[in-house]
Each structure stands twice: as structure tokens, then as C-alpha cells.
Amino acid sequence: MRYYLGIDGGGTKTDAALCDEFGRIAARTLGPAGNLVDIGISAYAALLGQLLDGLAQQTGGSLPPVAAAFAGLSGGSDPQIAADCRLLLRNRLPDTPLVAGGDDRQSLLAGGLYGADGCVLISGTGCACTARVNGQQHSIGGWGFLFDGKGGGFDIGRDAVMAALRAYDGRGEPTRLLPLLEAELGCGIEQALPGLYREGKRRIASLAPLVFSAAQEGDAAASGILDENMRELALWLDTAAKYFSGSFPTVVAGGILMKSDDALRRLCGFVKSDTCPARMAMAPVFGAVVAAMLLDGVSEQRLRGMDFSL
């Protein structure tokens, strides 16, 4: 029996799974955020050990021989980060012949398109887009929270705080976001700011669901925030269309687009190119498992027949 390891590390959590050659799940475990840029190599090494130990506990105390392993990380498009990830994996899995680490978009391209051409769009804590054409990958957006202003949970949460502050100090119109945020944060919006600065991206991204709630109540500011962010993601897909000669498949992933029908509806309404964004059918961690299987030469036909179940 051949086994494959996949790891999906995002801005909120890290998911690891071990599957056999038929796609049956042998073990699965969760850990904290796994963006190597944010947590650093030492913390990621400790996290990797925690994940592999958690998997081993579910397989009799030790991992079976692993034919191939792939770790897809938020921030893994940086060649040095990808190299660090591979080294850490190889150190922990010295007998595994095929080990690779890279961008979490590679996991989604594998799990959503099985190595075929198309586009993947992520909107989670952060956001990113990649077009794959004739084996070549082209990045659109996804340059990090300092340089990409719209599209992810952090952006939506930050925009909500900004709208609430404008309502609070009189620069903006009243918005339901102000009382919703104050209730969530447990204090006035001004008093909440030091804590938000300390807690950073993940805490701010966690406020994004309040924007969807306010938009459902008819709040104009909240609806405007969602439109601005989904319009930016639509622009990314329209930019990706330049790499294709006609229609192309698009797979979407990440908490914003996977959990919110409103977000996906708005996105589809703004897209001008010939593509129909569809949610990824499997969890991203199984996309990482598929990426590992592709390393080992498993065919697209076999992969499409797997449902990754217990």
C-alpha cells in the first residue's frame, strides 16, 4: 500500500492528512496558522512536528512509509520559503523519496483541476489568484496584506472597522457595522483599537462575517464593502482570462468564497470573462494530497475517481 501526505497551511489554521493510494483517509489532524512568513521557520518546524505526531498517533504510533509528501503554504510562492519547507519536511521524512513544498495555490490547482489548465482563486484570511496554462503558472494579485488592498477576509474586516470609525467620529454615514463590531469586541470601537493592533491580521479577518450580516440587514456601507472586495477579485479573474484563448474553468477556495453564497454571487456578477467560478469540491488539504500523488505519477483519471473518505 502506498501512502501520501498533504499539508495545507493558511493564515488561520493548518490541516494535514495522510491518505492511501485509493484516496482513503488514514489520518487527519489540525494545527494553528501555518503561514511561514508570519510565524517563522522555528515555529513552523515545531508545528510540522506537532502535525506529524498527531497523524502518527492515529496510525499505530508511527507513520507508515510515505511515497510522496506535499506542503502548500500561504506565502509559499517565495522560493526561499518553499525551499525551507522542503528541507523541514525532508528532515522529518528522510525515507520519503518525493517531497515538495510551495504555494497553497498549487494544492488548489491540483485538487480542483487535477493538473489541467485553469484558474484558482482564494479568498480566506488573505487572497490570491493563479492561472495555469500549458504547465506554466501565472500569479495575479496575492502580494500580501501590505500591497493588496481588497479581496480577503482581512481586507473586509479592516474595511468594516474603517467604516465603523468613520461613523463613530462623524466623517461617514451611520452604519450597522458600528454596534455589531462593538458587541463582538466587547467595548467601544475606539477602546478596541489597541487590541486589534496587537492581535493583528487573524483577529481583523475574523470580523468579516459581521459585514455579511450587516449587508443582509440592508446596510449600505456593508454592501459597499462587499461589492468593492468582490469587484477586485473579479478583476483578477478577468486579468487571468488574458492567458486563455477562450473559456476556462475557475475553482474558488478560502473561507470567504466557500462559506458565503452572497460573496460568490457578487463575484460572479462582476466577472466579465468567460468563466464560471465554482467552489472546490474537496478540502484544500486533499488538494495537497493530490499534489503529492501527482508527484508520484498518479494519473488524472485515477485521481478523479477518488472521493477522499474514511
Name the predicted role of every residue range.
Residues 8, 104, 124:
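Active-site glycine-centered loops adjacent to acidic/histidine catalytic or metal-binding residues
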Residues 1-64, 91-92, 112-119, 162-310:
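ATP-binding/phosphotransfer module of carbohydrate and carboxylate kinases, centering on a glycine-rich
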Residues 78-79, 107-109, 128-129, 257-260:
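Short, active-site-adjacent cap segments at secondary-structure transitions
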Residues 27-30, 100, 138:
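Structural signal for short hydrophobic segments within the conserved structured cores
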Residues 53-93, 98-100, 112-113:
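Short beta-strand-loop/turn "lid" adjacent to the catalytic site in phosphate-handling enzymes
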